[in-house]
Amino acid sequence: MTSRTIILRFESRNGQFRLNVSPQDMFPSLETKILEHLPPDTEPSSIKLSNKPIGAAGDERFLNTLDGVSFEQVGLRSGHGDKLYIGYQSKQDLQDGASNGTAAGSSARRLNGAPINQEITPTSRAQADRVASVTVKNPWDAVRQSALDDRLEKKDGKIHRSRDNKMCKHSAKGMCDYCMPLEPYDPKYLAEKKIKHLSFHSYLRKINAATNKPELKSSFMPPLSEPYYRVRTDCPSGHPPWPEGICTKCQPSAISLQPQEYRMVDHVEFSTPDLINSLLDFWRKSGTQRLGYLYGTYEEYDEVPLGIKAVVQAIYEPPQVDEVDGVTLHEWENEKDVDEIARLCGLEKVGVIFTDLLDAGRGDGSVLCKRHIDSYYLSSLEIAFASRLQMQQPKATRWSRTGYFGSNFVTCVLSGDEEGAITISSYQASVAAVEMIRADIIEPSAEPSVMLVQSEDDDTNKSRYIPEVFYRKINEYGVSAQVNAKPAFPVEYLLVTLTHGFPTESKPLFIDSTYPIENREVIGEGQEFHSLARKLVSHGDPQKAIRAVSDFHLLCFLRTFSTFSKEEEALLCRVATTQNPTDGLQLINTPGWATLVTILQDSGERPPKRPWLDPSHPVPQPGKRYSPSSRHESPRSESEQLAKRFKGASLR
């Protein structure tokens, strides 16, 4: 029996053509047929296929690297007229590229001239995310979401109510409108509990109830879709790509800003107040601001229906230049190492925190209140900063058409309140704000309370398309009216507020916090060998050493030694988080720990120098008393010692 065939359309810069193929055929089998429609001097090894026009951020694969991949494996099994884009290079172009010492196109080659397999070439996270949308027909079926989201999906989510003795007229086992369970998105319940935003899973159930109806037995459609405010490069109309051409199918629609009704995370919980005090100590000692990244976990939050909270266990302070009115971040070279230590401890990067403090000058520790209802809560520059960080930490969910939606990344600010006390405020940038930053539609303003809308006439990027942006406000007549957002609009439309707090009983993951924090040399606090030796080897007590490693900053510093293997490093992090004595004894008997102790003993703590002792007298040994003849030669006080040192250094 002959197998059925499907029609595939191909488009290159040389034109368009069609081919009849079998769904079971492999991609490399098309090489001969494709070459018939390309110029005679085309290099066969340079042919690549993409789901989007070449160079338009599609998933580009070289044809010779798709050996063993059939058409039906990538979803080309039943439809007719599916379109693929072809890129190629001539042999002359490849020769010119080689003579100039550059690789032709985007292909990489080995020393023998053979092309490198693109599947083993390292790719960025964004490129890896796009692969799923091409090789898998439904990206939401292949995405792997967090275990917390899986647990919340299995929950009933209903808000159970007890029997109302005044209104309920039924028996104890009956139910009526006054005692039946409520949906997690019930507006009356949220207003009663003063919950400003829906939790993510409550919002998900609200929109899914309108999108997918099980009683209709229809196919599943993800109810979530991230906003897209950029010109689509894969327009099916056939016109030249933007900026040469545009149509109603590929241009973004007008944007109507409105406050976001849900939030991805509902609460930020700091495991211990020491985390905040440690960050504040830098401001108290230097008078400048400080920024740190929050490492912790996401857990269920029972105060909100189907809520999520970020539990912070550690704050890592990256390299930065601190100033009175802000910070300037430097390149964070060991970010991957810190993330790996956090992963071994069961943590992940959950947010960022920074200070914005200015002493009130009263001498009582009070600070100025700079953020309030008449000024701003998060400036336009800080919203842009938070949006870019959320962009780097997308949330994987099977309820989105792209497999990703929003972000769980939070932003916290330490600033003064109306009473002059230091308080924490937690926020997230809205999903619309993240996409507007990604599309380069908005930019921060010198006025912190407003965000500027970009102009298409900007000389730096003439190919940018800026859609119309509107927002609603109460006009002078007391009526809600839609207003054009150009040139600027209030930042409140891009913000989502979160709650914060501390647990009633503090149970931090790391029980030791005495080791110096990284990148604090400017205030005289550095991570050095002698301080590490004092904590781990100088006291000679293994149990104290086991307790001392329960410090996130110390773990990150130990990774710079490279003395532990992967298994030993995992054991080290397990001891730091569980403080298990059995694992601790196993740790101190590993070769990596022995190497570390040797290094610290050779270059760690040294006996203190006593320059006032006479050179003819031997240096006193530890545990021995000074002889009477040596006691009278030491100075009577530190001031006398300092005076003698200055006298010896006198020029007269």
From Swiss-Prot:
InterPro entries, alphabetized: MPN, Npl4, NPL4_C, NPL4_Zn-bd_put, Ubiquitin-like_domsf
GO molecular function: ubiquitin binding; ubiquitin protein ligase binding
UniProt cross-references to CDD domains, sorted A to Z: MPN_NPL4 (cd08061)
Limits of the MPN domain: 268-405
Biased composition range(s): Low complexity: 97-108
Its biological purpose: Involved in the import of nuclear-targeted proteins into the nucleus and the export of poly(A) RNA out of the nucleus. Has a role in the endoplasmic reticulum-associated degradation (ERAD) pathway.
Family: Belongs to the NPL4 family.
Official protein name in the record: Nuclear protein localization protein 4
